[in-house]
């Protein structure tokens, strides 16, 4: 099992820091929203909660953002499905989840997509940022348990897939996670950004709704 990858980002290096919900191949929508936010790549940072690919029409264009110094991402379950398909040769689950875009690419584009997706073997599962003494932890779906600790070993699947915590929250059973002030997640789709206890869910379903949500850390 691969070890859990954490990364700390120094907020002082940037004018503004935004976290974006699941992009799912909506490159043009992302660019439009960044323009509306007056995002300036030379001094701002954009962090994705993962699931950059699938469903939308421009997954490769979104993956190419990994080459830009102003963009980074944690790993999502859709990136994990793609990597598993490459490693096992069984792409059925990925195809059923929107991975068909890959097979519409030509050979050189497919190789480029593979090379970019392989970056998720090294990109973090969790990003930690502290700004104005407020500590944020960013992961794709959840941070299991009730205590966050930078560097704690966690099974990758527990960060990429679970929805049980948020489902309990929807039923009124709020669960605080200690160790950070706020946790920012995607994965679970809502019409608008939702906050339960100290967990903020920012996936608003861009391919189906035309909504792509951002949370401003700084």
UniProtKB/Swiss-Prot annotation:
Q: Which GO terms describe its biological process?
A: RNA decapping
Which reaction(s) are listed as its catalytic activity?
O-phospho-L-seryl-[protein] + H2O = L-seryl-[protein] + phosphate; O-phospho-L-threonyl-[protein] + H2O = L-threonyl-[protein] + phosphate
In which residues is Mn(2+) 2 bound? Answer: 51, 77, 187
Q: Which Pfam families match?
A: Metallophos
Q: Which cysteines are joined by disulfide bonds?
A: none
What does the record give under GO molecular function? bis(5'-nucleosyl)-tetraphosphatase (symmetrical) activity; metal ion binding; phosphatase activity; protein serine/threonine phosphatase activity; protein tyrosine/serine/threonine phosphatase activity
UniProt EC number: 3.1.3.16
Which metal ions or organic cofactors does this protein require, according to UniProt? Mn(2+)
Report the sequence similarity comment from the record: Belongs to the PPP phosphatase family.
Quote the function comment for this protein.
Answer: Has been shown, in vitro, to act on Ser, Thr and Tyr-phosphorylated substrates.
Q: What is the name of this protein?
A: Serine/threonine-protein phosphatase 2
Q: Which organism is it from?
A: Escherichia coli (strain K12)
Gene transcribed to yield this protein: pphB
């Amino acid at each position: 099992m691969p070890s859990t990858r954490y990364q700390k980002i120094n907020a002082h290096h940037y004018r503004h820091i935004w976290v974006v919900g699941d992009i799912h191949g909506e490159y043009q929508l992302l660019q439009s929203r960044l323009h509306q936010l007056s995002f300036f790549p030379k001094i701002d940072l954009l962090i994705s909660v993962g699931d950059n690919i699938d469903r939308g029409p421009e997954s490769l264009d979104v993956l190419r953002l990994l080459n830009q110094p102003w963009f980074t991402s944690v790993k999502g379950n859709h990136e994990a499905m793609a990597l598993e398909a490459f490693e096992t040769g069984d792409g059925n689950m990925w195809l059923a989840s929107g991975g068909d875009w890959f097979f519409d690419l030509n050979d050189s584009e497919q190789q480029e997509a593979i090379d970019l997706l392989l970056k998720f073997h090294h990109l973090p599962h969790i990003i930690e940022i502290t700004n104005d003494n407020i500590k944020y932890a960013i992961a794709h779906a959840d941070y299991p348990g009730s205590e966050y600790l930078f560097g704690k070993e966690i099974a990758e699947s527990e960060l990429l897939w679970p929805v049980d915590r948020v489902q309990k929250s929807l039923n009124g059973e709020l669960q605080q996670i200690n160790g950070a002030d706020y946790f920012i997640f995607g994965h679970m789709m809502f019409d608008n950004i939702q906050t339960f206890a100290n967990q903020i869910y920012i996936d608003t379903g861009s391919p189906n709704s035309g909504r792509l949500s951002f949370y401003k850390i700084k």
